């Protein structure tokens, strides 16, 4: 009981002392320390002993605090120091965060300044180039070109790199201008204006006009501070002395005018130094470039710079990246080969067109023969009689009688009827205009061309001779009639054979023309090759030429035999004229074929040359 009572008393005393001193324990002010707070693992006596030890410690601290006179002030000071320490730590953290933010802000600000400076430099660069181009086009009052191309980056770099030299130049220029003004004022105090008007009365008007023109066409940035007179003496500009004397008088009267004049002169001095530096870089390059002011207003900075780079000449000092001579040679060779190839293809197409026109004209000159059914029947009868083609002649040769033997009256009547029908058909052909244009046989005995009247007269004479021959009994008249009839029939047979051979040749030629027209139509197609197309045609033409030559040789041999037989009968025979006509016609056909073959060969040669050029061009590329 005593121990429990003593422990409770001690507990109360310690709690009262702690509350009185304001000491904050582990459980906070006003919160009593219970045995449960010590932990559930301790036994009751262990908890009591631990609590007792803590209480003794608190009592000792309270006794020590109570002994000090200013214990509350000390506690408050300690608390204040602790709070200050905590605040200082927070401030350090805040300072660190603020330093990071400040650095980021400074970096952003620097980046913005750099971006702004780059944009301004680009604007100034483009504006300076525009002004220089406009000044070059206008000639700056004299209509003359500058001696060299402006280097746009030169003055900017000089101004940015060497500012003290620029200041010294300004000071030197100002001092020179002042000394010049003083000298001019001493030399020409009053008589400057009348001397100027007397010396050159027309010069001020021209200078005024040029000054106005330049001021109107110049950009607005330079229009404000630009003075009318020019300081340069060379390059087609007027003298300085009269204007300077006038300006000196004005400057004496008005100090503002003097200040403006000094600024303008300084600017012109800067321009002169910049121009002198640019002239040293490259001399002798005179070039006019179209102005970019109107074009560059609605474009971005990159577009303006690209346009200026494209329009700038190759020999200027700005364009340092020169093309190598090997690449220039290859480009020239490529352009040369390309031009030659284009010319070759143009010539090829022109030759194709000419060949087609030539063939069309050749085909139009020989139209088709309109064969009638009566004519075909008459030709069949003539072939049956044995005087048409060489085959008919071969079949009729064994049936023909010798020249000296007499013939039967039935055979003579049949031959006479056949000759009459042949004459009628022949006269019908002569009446046809197309046939008259192509075939015009002549007779040697009468030396007259064939006409309807002549044909009728011959027919009547033959009929009269035949009628008198049947009535006569004397052998002389019979032999004469037989000889004349035989000659006439032979002539008619030769004519009919020649006409049949001509018609056959014409039919063959028409077939060839049709094939050639088809080939020409196929030639116009780009994928068809001309060699493959012409090989078959050339082979066919060669075969046909061989056949025609063989047939001509056979017909000439048969005609030679007939001529020999006819010469035995009579010295005069009209078969020679028909043979001459056949020879002429065949010769014309051969000439035309030779021309076509020659044109084909030339065309092939041209194609081979064009292919070679194309291969060389492809190898070069």
From Swiss-Prot:
It comes from Homo sapiens (Human). Its main location: other. GO terms for biological process: regulation of centriole replication. It is found in: Cell projection, Cilium. The keyword Metal-binding does not apply. This is CEP295 N-terminal-like protein. Transmembrane segments: none annotated. PANTHER family: ALMS1-RELATED, CEP295 N-TERMINAL-LIKE PROTEIN. The lineage of its organism: Eukaryota, Metazoa, Chordata, Craniata, Vertebrata. It comes from the Eukaryota. Keywords: Cell projection, Cilium, Coiled coil. Residues 171-185, 219-229, 505-529 have a biased composition (Basic and acidic residues). Residues 203-213, 568-578 have a biased composition (Polar residues). Residues 142-253, 385-421, 491-529, 543-586 are annotated as: Disordered. Residues 159-170 have a biased composition (Basic residues). GO terms for cellular component: centriole; centrosome; cilium; cytosol. Residues 328-359, 498-525 form a coiled coil. The keyword Cell inner membrane does not apply.
């Amino acid at each position: 009981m005593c121990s429990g009572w003593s422990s409770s008393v001690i507990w109360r005393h310690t709690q009262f002392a702690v509350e009185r001193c304001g000491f904050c324990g582990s459980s906070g002010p006003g919160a009593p320390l219970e045995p449960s707070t010590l932990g559930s693992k301790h036994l009751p006596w262990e908890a009591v002993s631990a609590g007792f030890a803590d209480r003794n410690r608190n009592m000792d601290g309270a006794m020590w605090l109570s002994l000090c006179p200013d214990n509350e002030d000390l506690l408050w000071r300690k608390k204040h120091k602790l709070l200050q320490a905590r605040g200082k730590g927070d401030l350090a953290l805040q300072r660190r965060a603020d330093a990071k933010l400040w650095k980021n802000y400074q970096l952003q600000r620097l980046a913005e300044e750099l971006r702004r400076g780059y944009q301004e430099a680009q604007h100034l660069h483009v504006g300076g180039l525009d002004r220089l181009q406009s000044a070059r086009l206008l000639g700056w009052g004299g209509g003359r070109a500058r001696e060299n191309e402006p280097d746009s980056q030169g003055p900017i770099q000089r101004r940015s790199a060497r500012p003290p030299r620029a200041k010294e130049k300004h000071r030197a220029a100002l001092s020179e201008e002042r000394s010049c003004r003083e000298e001019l004022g001493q030399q020409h105090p009053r008589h400057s204006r009348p001397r100027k008007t007397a010396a050159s009365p027309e010069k001020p008007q021209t200078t005024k006009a040029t000054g106005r023109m330049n001021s109107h066409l110049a950009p607005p940035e330079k229009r404000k501070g630009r003075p009318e007179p020019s300081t340069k003496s060379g390059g087609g500009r007027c003298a300085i002395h009269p204007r300077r004397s006038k300006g000196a008088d004005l400057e004496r009267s008005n100090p503002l005018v003097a200040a403006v004049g000094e600024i303008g002169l300084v600017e012109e001095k800067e321009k002169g130094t910049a121009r002198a530096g640019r002239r040293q870089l490259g001399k002798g390059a005179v070039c006019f470039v179209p102005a970019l002011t109107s074009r560059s207003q609605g474009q971005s900075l990159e577009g303006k710079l690209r346009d200026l780079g494209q329009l700038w000449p190759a020999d200027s000092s700005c364009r340092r990246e020169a093309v190598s001579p090997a690449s220039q040679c290859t480009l020239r060779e490529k352009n040369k080969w390309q031009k030659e190839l284009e010319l070759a293809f143009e010539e090829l197409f022109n030759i194709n067109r000419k060949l087609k026109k030539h063939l069309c004209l050749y085909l139009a000159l020989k139209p088709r023969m309109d064969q009638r059914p009566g004519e075909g029947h008459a030709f069949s009868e003539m072939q049956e009689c044995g005087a048409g083609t060489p085959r008919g002649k071969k079949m009729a040769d064994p049936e023909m009688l010798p020249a000296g033997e007499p013939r039967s009256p039935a055979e003579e009547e049949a031959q006479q009827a056949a000759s009459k029908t042949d004459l009628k058909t022949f006269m019908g052909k002569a009446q046809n205009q197309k046939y008259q244009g192509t075939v015009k046989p002549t007779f040697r005995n009468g030396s007259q061309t064939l006409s309807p009247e002549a044909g009728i007269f011959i027919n009547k004479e033959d009929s009269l001779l035949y009628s008198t021959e049947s009535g006569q009994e004397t052998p002389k008249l019979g032999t004469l009639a037989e000889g004349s009839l035989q000659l006439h029939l032979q002539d008619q047979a030769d004519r009919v054979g020649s006409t049949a051979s001509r018609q056959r040749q014409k039919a063959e030629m028409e077939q060839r023309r049709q094939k050639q027209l088809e080939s020409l139509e196929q030639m116009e197609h780009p994928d068809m090759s001309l060699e493959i197309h012409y090989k078959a045609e050339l082979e066919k033409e060669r075969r046909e030429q061989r056949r025609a030559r063989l047939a001509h040789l056979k017909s000439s041999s048969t005609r030679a035999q007939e001529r020999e037989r006819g010469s035995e009968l009579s010295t005069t025979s009209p078969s020679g004229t028909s043979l001459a006509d056949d020879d002429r016609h065949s010769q014309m056909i051969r000439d035309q074929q030779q021309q076509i073959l020659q044109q084909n060969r030339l065309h092939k040669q041209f194609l081979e040359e064009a292919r070679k050029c194309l291969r060389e061009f492809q190898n070069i590329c």
